[in-house]
Design a protein with these regions (language model features):
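Short coil/turn motifs that cap or connect alpha-helices
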Residues: 213, 252, 421-422, 461
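Small/polar-residue-enriched beta-strand and adjacent coil segments characteristic
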Residues: 22, 57-58, 66-67, 71-74, ...
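Amphipathic alpha-helical coiled-coil segments
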Residues: 84-99, 164, 170-191, 195-198, ...
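Terminal intrinsically disordered/low-complexity segments used for targeting and assembly
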Residues: 2-77, 148-151, 235-282, 288, ...
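Periplasmic alpha-helical coiled-coil/stalk elements that build and connect Gram-negative outer-membrane
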Residues: 3, 21, 143, 159-276, ...
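Charged, alpha-helical scaffolding/interaction elements associated with membrane systems
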Residues: 78-79, 209, 418
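Residues within alpha-helical transmembrane segments of multi-pass membrane proteins, especially transporters
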Residues: 12-16, 103, 343, 371, ...
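Phosphate-coordinating loops and pocket residues in cytosolic domains that bind phosphorylated ligands
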Residues: 219, 282-283, 428
Length: 466
């Protein structure tokens, strides 16, 4: 009885000793070369609204149009790229569970019957055992570091999924806005074409009566064909926009959810800079993913270092053995075994050192990628913040330009009808008003798209309210 008890105690002690040490290097301190404040051009005149709050704003709270919300919901359910990201998370979770299982003994039951014979009579032996097979004592943290690396890789994939979701939300919003803007451009072109065609008919009638020159007729036809070309171009663009939205949504989008000829104000929140860049950028899911990849690579160095040291694995079992199946569990049939095994690497042909070098290189690569992610994030955020104020000013000026151009067109038409202005002056006024209306739509789209970009680059929340 005492020997099996000693074997059990030895196994318990091994569990305590397992993982007592680790050779993982200390986490590398990262100080990316980014300014401690946003550029002065970005912060000038901005209200004190913290950008750090953007990460906590769910997309349903940011994009308030119910049609756009419905399309985003459809895309999150059906988009194939996001589905791949979700499956990568599941795969990483399973890999972590596999690696974590190596930190505890694998206990199994084994039953066996042996028949042997020769010149002597046939003999039979029956046995049933409960035991542990090849459990490694993690004295130098190899198993623990491998488990930690798998855990950090799982966290990285989870952050990648959030990044993919945020990117998808932004792409759907931009595609939806672009469809609305191009539909508005098509409507403007169609209305302008109808007006020009009316003018052409009047000019042709006046030409027959001798009241219009051949030059006026040709110039009017030029306007008509220009507008007709724009109608065809924007009609094709609208069709392409719908196809892009269908691809992002993962299937057909109900016509009632599509924007009509409009540029919708989708953003109810106008996040502006006040927080520190580091506070903002570290909440971006792509930066978080890069950080977890760095931590995973760091843990792999610990596992590679531990491979240089001896490893001890234990195999033990306790059970019964008998020559009669009916007496397998009778008294006096108990058996046990305890088999420690030592593995001491002596010569591996440079394999262990190469593995360590590869793990170190992977860590250095991950560090560079982490720093690059932060620097890229700072530039993207600074660019979007700088454009925010500029586009507001452009939109205000463009709206004033449209009002002035339309007023000039009305006055020019009246003066032409009264015989005070030339037909060329009227044509210039019409072209100016048409171009101004088109530019206004483009500026509105640019402003809204920048709001979407700002939400994305500041790590906008991926949660939705219930």
């Amino acid at each position: 009885m005492r020997k099996p008890m000693m074997a059990s105690v030895a196994l318990a002690v091994s569990l305590v000793l397992s993982g007592c040490s680790t050779l993982e290097p200390r986490s590398t301190e990262v100080a990316p070369a980014i300014p401690s404040q946003w550029p002065a051009a970005v912060t000038a005149g901005a209200p004190a609204t913290s950008t750090a709050e953007v990460a906590d704003i769910g997309w349903r709270d940011f994009f308030v149009d119910p049609r756009l919300q419905a399309v985003i919901t459809q895309s999150l359910e059906n988009n194939r790229d996001l589905r791949v990201a979700v499956l990568n998370v599941e795969r990483a979770r399973a890999q972590y569970r596999i690696q974590r299982a190596d930190r505890v003994p694998a206990v199994g039951v084994q039953g066996q019957m042996t028949r042997s014979g020769g010149d002597a009579p046939v003999t039979e032996q029956f046995s049933a055992n409960l035991g542990v097979v090849e459990f490694e004592l993690d004295l130098f943290g190899r198993v623990r570091n491998l488990s930690q690396a798998a855990l950090q890789q799982y966290f990285a994939e989870a952050a990648n999924r959030r990044s993919a979701q945020l990117s998808l939300v932004a792409e759907v919003a931009n595609a939806w806005l672009t469809l609305g803007a191009d539909s508005e451009q098509l409507r403007i072109a169609q209305a302008t074409l109808a007006t020009y065609e009316d003018s052409l008919r009047l000019t042709e009638a006046r030409r027959e009566l001798g009241g219009a020159s051949a030059l006026e007729l040709s110039q009017t036809r030029t306007l008509v064909e220009t507008a007709r070309t724009d109608v065809a171009r924007f009609a094709g663009q609208v069709a392409q926009d719908r196809n892009a939205l269908v691809l992002l949504a993962g299937g057909p989008v109900d016509a009632t959810l599509l924007p009509q000829a409009e540029v919708t104000e989708v953003a109810s929140v106008r996040p502006l800079p006040a927080g520190m860049p580091g506070d903002v950028l570290l909440r971006r899911p792509d930066v978080m993913a890069a950080e977890h990849v760095l931590l995973s690579a760091n843990a792999n160095i610990g596992a590679a270092r531990a491979a240089f040291f001896p490893s001890i694995s234990l195999t033990g079992s306790i059970g019964s053995a008998s020559s009669e199946l009916s007496g397998l569990f009778d008294s006096g049939t108990r058996v046990w075994s305890f088999i420690p095994k030592l593995n001491l690497p002596i010569f591996q042909g440079g394999k262990l050192r190469a593995n360590l070098g590869m793990a170190t290189a992977d860590r250095d690569i991950a560090l560079a990628q982490y720093e690059r992610a932060i620097q890229s994030g700072f530039r993207e955020a600074a660019d979007a913040l700088a454009l925010n104020e500029s586009l507001d000013a452009q939109l205000s000026s463009q709206q004033a330009l449209v009002a002035a151009a339309e007023q000039a067109q009305r006055l020019s038409q009246a003066r032409y009808d009264a015989g005070l202005d030339s037909f060329l002056t009227l044509l210039d006024a019409r072209r100016t008003a048409y171009t101004a209306r088109q530019s206004l739509v483009s500026t509105q789209l640019a402003q809204q798209s920048n709001q979407v970009a700002l939400y994305k680059v500041l790590g906008g929340g991926w949660h939705e309210r219930g």
